[in-house]
Amino acid sequence: MKITGIQNIPIEVPYYERLGPHMQRVRQTPKYPMIRTHIYIVETDVGLTGYGEGPNLGDGVEAYIGHHPVEYLMDDRAGGVQIACYDLVGKFLGQPAHRLYGPQVRSEVLMCYWTHCFVPEMMAAEARLAYENGFRVHKLKARPWESTVEQVAAMTEGMPADYRIVVDPNGSYGRPTEALRTIRELEAFPHVWALEEPISWDQVDGYKFLKSHIDFPIALHADIPSVLTAVREGLCDYFVSEFHYSAKLVQDCAIARAGENREFWVENGLWTGISHAFQLHQAAAIANIYLLITLSVLAEDDMIIEPMIVKDGYMAVPEGSGLGVTLDVDALENRRIG
């Protein structure tokens, strides 16, 4: 099997209308922000077609033509083409893509809803919508222009006990002692489950301080500091992997398993159902992936035909060969730009 052609198609997909003005405010853009990404359609000499999604590779896609898709399963530089190669090799073997990572360890994966830093009333509405749509974990982007405590109070009022919140300030809580004051207020809310990067990643001693003073689990991005450093220094309980398509994720998860078996939150399939299906397959085979995050559930179209359903917090891993999902060609024509 050889790659004979690659289509690199840029698309724009609006967020749902209810989110538009709020996303515009937090992103400070002149018009409503959109999901902007690229769909890759990879054709082969055996009649199989693979689908991927990711950043623009430009003319670089020409380098993959004439090669076997298996060459790029662990080449993260291939981005969306790499995802398409998993789809192709799985289809060629008649196996789901997760079999290319190893034995299946789970058939469904815990999902996390995502909301930016909106006013408390909007946060409350999103919390209820998330729960009604099957989510049980909800990630909140905390920022200085809104009170995290007021947001959490609005989000949790009347919510069932199995609803959990991850607070993600992206390092904006300042110094460790400043962060601790806010965290102490959050301790009053049983629904708050974990913190992601409460202070800037370079404050190694600061994370040690927080770990010794709070009970909330802490998550850090897997590349800042390195997984090895974070494990050695005992800085966190979870790692977040973002935009590390395959090789880097496998490597980081292996290091984390060796160091007290820390688990991962993966968000490398943010924008469409294609990349989200890919991360579902990764989670099906990599034992210490704990939950997945995707923004495709916030968009008017996830670009695939099959429904992606969350039930009681979990989403099933696609069962078909390859990625197990089908590109919606009508949606592609409607969303393509340029």
Predicted regions and their residues:
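Shared catalytic-loop signature of beta/alpha-barrel
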Residues: 21-23, 67, 73, 184, ...
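N-terminal capping/lid subdomain adjacent to the active-site entrance of alpha/beta enzymes
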Residues: 1-166, 170-184, 188, 213, ...
